[in-house]
């Protein structure tokens, strides 16, 4: 990666994004030395313009930013770093430097899909998910049907708390069903996205 450090007197902006939630956590600046150290250690290191030295995020608090990926923009003068934060990012104690909560619950579905994929690949004994895969597609489909019925019952005659509980079970078993057929939850998301594009006229 050939970065252009000349435009800002030896610095490039580095946008830090949570690898899971995709929330923007903070913005810092790197010189070449800070960038090289970040790549070498796997922990985000900036150049402090006030202290005039390198500083690794978390060197005092322990709230390191563990690098997952580093990308340059089209002009090679700005970085997007996806990282796993070890704790609150801002020195004020908030999750982000904009005072936002670092959470995006819907993104957990991808993490859940990855977990179920791993179960399908490794098939560890004693795992409930393994037992589902071992039972075969018909049993998995039956389980999805049962969870769907339970969700409907809670929606019509149950409590809101139980509706959420049973709905979560339904989604979990649906992901298992998709995985057993070679698909992922993202495939459903793509289908919904296509349906709601500007060219989709049925809704």
UniProtKB/Swiss-Prot annotation:
Region of interest (Phosphoribosyl-ATP pyrophosphohydrolase), residue spans: 109-203
Any GO molecular function: phosphoribosyl-ATP diphosphatase activity
EC assignment: 3.5.4.19, 3.6.1.31
Xref: InterPro entries: His_synth_HisIE (IPR023019), HisE (IPR008179), PRib-ATP_PPHydrolase-like (IPR021130), PRib_AMP_CycHydrolase_dom (IPR002496), PRib_AMP_CycHydrolase_sf (IPR038019)
EC class (word): hydrolase
Gene Ontology biological process terms, A to Z: L-histidine biosynthetic process
Reactions this protein catalyses: 1-(5-phospho-beta-D-ribosyl)-ATP + H2O = 1-(5-phospho-beta-D-ribosyl)-5'-AMP + diphosphate + H(+); 1-(5-phospho-beta-D-ribosyl)-5'-AMP + H2O = 1-(5-phospho-beta-D-ribosyl)-5-[(5-phospho-beta-D-ribosylamino)methylideneamino]imidazole-4-carboxamide
Entry's Gene Ontology cellular component terms: cytoplasm
Keyword Cytoplasm: yes
Tree of life domain: Bacteria
Compartments it resides in: Cytoplasm
UniProtKB keywords: Amino-acid biosynthesis, ATP-binding, Cytoplasm, Histidine biosynthesis, Hydrolase, Multifunctional enzyme, Nucleotide-binding
Family indicated by similarity: In the N-terminal section; belongs to the PRA-CH family. In the C-terminal section; belongs to the PRA-PH family.
PANTHER family in the cross-refs: HISTIDINE BIOSYNTHESIS BIFUNCTIONAL PROTEIN, HISTIDINE BIOSYNTHESIS BIFUNCTIONAL PROTEIN HISIE
Name of protein: Histidine biosynthesis bifunctional protein HisIE
Organism: Bacteroides thetaiotaomicron (strain ATCC 29148 / DSM 2079 / JCM 5827 / CCUG 10774 / NCTC 10582 / VPI-5482 / E50)
């Amino acid at each position: 990666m050939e970065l252009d450090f000349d435009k800002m007197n030896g610095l490039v902006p580095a946008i830090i994004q949570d690898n899971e939630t995709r929330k923007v956590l903070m913005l810092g600046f790197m010189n070449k030395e800070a960038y090289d150290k970040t790549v070498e250690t796997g922990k985000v290191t900036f150049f402090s313009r006030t202290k005039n030295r390198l500083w690794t995020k978390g060197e005092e608090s322990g709230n390191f930013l563990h690098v997952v990926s580093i990308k340059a923009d089209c002009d090679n003068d700005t970085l997007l770093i996806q990282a796993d934060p070890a704790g609150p990012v801002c020195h004020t104690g908030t999750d982000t430097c904009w005072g936002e909560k670092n959470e995006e619950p819907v993104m957990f579905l991808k993490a859940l899909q990855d977990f179920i994929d791993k179960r399908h690949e490794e098939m560890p004994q004693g795992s409930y998910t393994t037992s589902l895969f071992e039972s075969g597609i018909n049993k998995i489909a039956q389980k999805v049907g049962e969870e769907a019925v339970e969700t409907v019952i809670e929606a019509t005659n149950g409590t809101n708390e139980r509706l959420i509980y049973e709905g979560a079970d339904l989604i979990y078993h649906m992901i298992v069903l998709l995985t057993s057929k070679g698909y992922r939850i993202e495939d459903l998301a793509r289908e919904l996205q296509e349906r709601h594009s500007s060219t989709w006229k049925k809704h």
